[in-house]
Amino acid sequence: ANLIRWEELTDIVLVGHSYGGCVISGVADRMSEKIAALVYLDAFVLENGQSLHDALPAEHRQGQLEAAAALGDGWRVPPIPAAVFNVNAADRAWVDDQCTDQPLASFQQKLHLDHSAAAVGSIHYIYAADWEATPFTGFYESAKARGWSTREIACGHDIMLDRPEELTAALLQAAAG
């Protein structure tokens, strides 16, 4: 949010991938007048007062807590292997090498919204439709029910790696309004 203020940015298209959906929701809630569009890219869409852990299935939440306790000194969650996200085989080793632990607190912190994000010009949801363990189906269905612009792309969670051309077209469409 500070970058938007400091650089005096306007007509922004904010894109949030995965956990980044939580971030763009918070930014949009605080400065919707600066944002032309939100794009949730196979992402979490939290409600006011909800944490990421609240939105996850119990088995995912428990797995993160156990991983943090066993491998993350109790405060960080090790990355999930790229294969789980159905990242294309050619990029899996690279993705695994780039990923880092995530603070457990980021999963537990509640998002506080006053719903001014509703003033954003357009909201889009792009769903990666080709990975079995996806926790995003419900968010995609909710986006459709809310009347948001939606699109399915048949690939794993890292759309930007698996289908960059389709993603570029979708983002340009969102930016065009």
Language-model segment annotations:
Residues A119, Y125-Y127:
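Short beta-strand/loop motif that positions the catalytic acidic residue
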Residues L3, A170-G177:
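C-terminal alpha-helix
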Residues D97-S116, A129-W131:
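Active-site nucleophile elbow and catalytic-triad environment of alpha/beta-hydrolase enzymes
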